[in-house]
């Protein structure tokens, strides 16, 4: 056997052995065949009392929601984890879940939602509206309403 074919056979043998190792390690159906099991989203906010709902959204009962603030900054790390997470809470809106009392969030934004009130079954619709209009959202609506009344139509 000439010496020029010996290196070629050696390289082919090495290639056959190394590719066999990769094939043995793969599960049936390929490396992505196992479904990703959902896990709890990362903790965030003051005292880690909230959960990440998106890369810039941190919400929790009793603390409300932080969007784009330093409290929600750690939620960006959720994008770099290989498996998906579930923030928890009841399903609301189109693809969201209840994040705090009266607030429904998905990975992009949050909206006020009466279905997310804690005692929504025991409250009348007028009480639900009053609860949603409390706090910062209610203050903003009152300011907008007051400024629109001052303008001539």
UniProtKB/Swiss-Prot annotation:
Disulfide bonds: 21-26, 41-85, 44-58, 52-75, 59-65, 92-104, 98-116, 105-110
Record-linked SMART domains: NH (SM00003)
InterPro entries linked: Neurhyp_horm, Neurhyp_horm_dom_sf, Neurohypophysial_hormone_CS
Keywords: Amidation, Cleavage on pair of basic residues, Disulfide bond, Hormone, Secreted, Signal
Domain of life: Eukaryota
UniProt GO molecular function: neurohypophyseal hormone activity
Signal peptide boundaries: 1-20
Residues where Glycine amide is found: 29
Xref: Gene3D superfamilies: Neurohypophysial hormone domain (2.60.9.10)
Subcellular location: Secreted
Modification note: Seven disulfide bonds are present in neurophysin.
UniProt keyword Cytoplasm present: no
GO CC terms: extracellular space; secretory granule
PANTHER family the record matches: NEUROPHYSIN, VASOPRESSIN-NEUROPHYSIN 2-COPEPTIN PRECURSOR
Family label: Belongs to the vasopressin/oxytocin family.
Function: Vasotocin is an antidiuretic hormone.
Protein name as catalogued: Vasotocin-neurophysin VT 1
Origin species: Oncorhynchus keta (Chum salmon)
């Amino acid at each position: 056997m000439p010496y020029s074919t010996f290196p070629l056979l050696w390289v082919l043998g090495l290639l056959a052995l190394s590719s066999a190792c990769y094939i043995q390690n793969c599960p049936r159906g390929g490396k992505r065949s196992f479904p990703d099991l959902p896990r709890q989203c990362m903790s965030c906010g003051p005292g880690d009392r909230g959960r990440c709902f998106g890369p810039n959204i941190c919400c929790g009962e009793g603390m409300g929601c932080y969007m784009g603030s330093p409290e929600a900054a750690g939620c960006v790390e959720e994008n770099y984890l290989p498996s998906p997470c579930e923030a928890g809470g009841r399903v609301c809106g189109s693809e969201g879940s209840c994040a705090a009392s009266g607030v429904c969030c998905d990975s992009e934004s949050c909206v006020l939602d009466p279905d997310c009130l804690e005692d929504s079954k025991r409250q009348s619709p007028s009480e639900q509206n009053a609860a949603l209009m409390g706090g910062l959202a209610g203050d903003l609506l009152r300011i907008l309403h007051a400024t629109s009344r001052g303008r001539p139509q």
